[in-house]
A protein has these predicted regions:
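Pyridoxal 5′-phosphate
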Residues: 1-140
């Protein structure tokens, strides 16, 4: 049998390193309960694991408060949350058609609902965006 070469990493990483499978298998066997919802031992231990992860990620990203770190399902969900959460009525967003659908779709949704205006800046045959085009698209 030949070894598979996975090239769809924009969708997910596969295969994952064995350490990930081992950790997650152990986590679900030992801590597969809702964190922070009850006072029994497994829930408390699970919350400690989750909060420990928050602390590690906060340090990794040079943050200052692990309680401000939010987990989501995936990058697409995160982008959707951020874009819809930050957009305000009357905002103008400059982007390109090179963006992933997880960026373009929420922007399109907000534009179609009259919340924001979107300007798409062009790109050349090599996929490069001219910074001057971005400057020209900006509004006060």
């Amino acid at each position: 049998m030949s070894q598979m070469i996975y090239l769809d990493n924009s969708a997910t990483t596969f295969p994952k390193p064995d350490v990930v499978y081992d950790f997650m298998c152990n986590f679900y066997r030992a801590h597969g309960v809702n964190p922070g919802r009850s006072g029994f031992d497994a829930a408390i231990e699970t919350e400690e694991v989750v909060f420990g992860t928050r602390k590690l990620l906060t340090e990794f990203f040079n943050g200052d408060d692990p309680n401000r770190l939010t987990f989501s399902y995936n990058a697409s969900d995160s982008l959707n949350m951020i874009i819809q959460g930050l957009a305000e009525k009357g905002d103008h967003v400059v982007t390109t058609m090179l963006e992933h659908n997880s960026v373009l779709r929420p922007l399109h949704h907000l534009q179609m609902n009259g919340i924001i205006e979107v300007t798409h800046v062009g790109f050349d045959a090599h996929g490069f965006v001219n910074p001057d085009d971005i400057k020209k698209a900006l509004r006060p």
